[in-house]
Amino acid sequence: YTSFQNTSGKLFTKGYSLKSYTDALKFLDNAIPNTFFIAGTSLILIVLLSIMVAYLVVRRNNFVNKFIDTLSMIPYVIPGSVVGISLVLGFSKKPFVLVGTFSIMIVALVIRRNSYTIRSSVAILQQIPISMEEAAISLGSSKMKAFFAVTMPMMMNGIVSGALLSWISIITELSSGIILYNYRTTTLTIQIYTYVSRGSYGIAAAMATILSLMTALSLMGFMFFSKNKNVMF
């Protein structure tokens, strides 16, 4: 509603138009592509990490792997600002200088948002009997080939469900990004925060609407995928 209202400085005025959207689009040349690049790269790494952790926890169950499983949940309860500050302190000196790059944004998101996909991947793998892999191995497949050819397709329900939650939380992430970004790595949520702090509420509302639309389209895409591929949430 407010994204369509006319504005004058910090004040909303009478009348409605698309001016806030036209103004917002002028400042989103980098923010939207950056959002998709950072989120997409982070999600790929999260999915790969989740598959590995799920396999270790369920198929190679021991104290070390249980500790890894517990450790993967800790970032979920740590504030994003703490993660951001820790990464700045840890990667601001040689030989690993990542501050101000896309890499440090991606690392922060992988750390903060991997728990959704890990938990759902572990849960779905626990429901798949190991005897199916053993049958494939007895027919001549290696353990790795049996896992990826037999078990992985059956894990897709849990992987996709967790990945959706991770994706939505990634594209709406602010608390760690606001500490780690620079002018080259700004994202849509950071742009929204910037314009709110400047008092440009109309532009901020338009950007927030665009972000909400991106989230809704992600959910719709998941529903379409689940309908056609028999994926359950």
Model-predicted regions and their roles:
Residues 74, 78, 111, 118-121, ...:
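Transmembrane alpha-helices
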Residues 9-18, 64-65, 81-112, 144, ...:
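Membrane-interfacial helix termini and adjacent extracytoplasmic/periplasmic loops
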Residues 27-39, 77, 86-117, 156-159:
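Loop-to-helix entry region at the N-terminal start of transmembrane alpha-helices
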Residues 1-4, 48-52, 85, 111-133, ...:
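Membrane-embedded alpha-helices of multi-pass transport/permease systems
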Residues 55-64, 122-132, 137, 141-149, ...:
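C-terminal transmembrane helix and the adjacent membrane-cytosol boundary/short C-terminal tail
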Residues 26-57, 67, 143:
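Transmembrane alpha-helix signature in integral membrane proteins
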Residues 3-10, 16-30, 171, 177-223, ...:
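Interhelical loop and adjacent transmembrane-helix boundary motif
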Residues 52-87:
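Cytoplasmic-entry segments and transmembrane alpha-helices of multi-pass inner-membrane transporters
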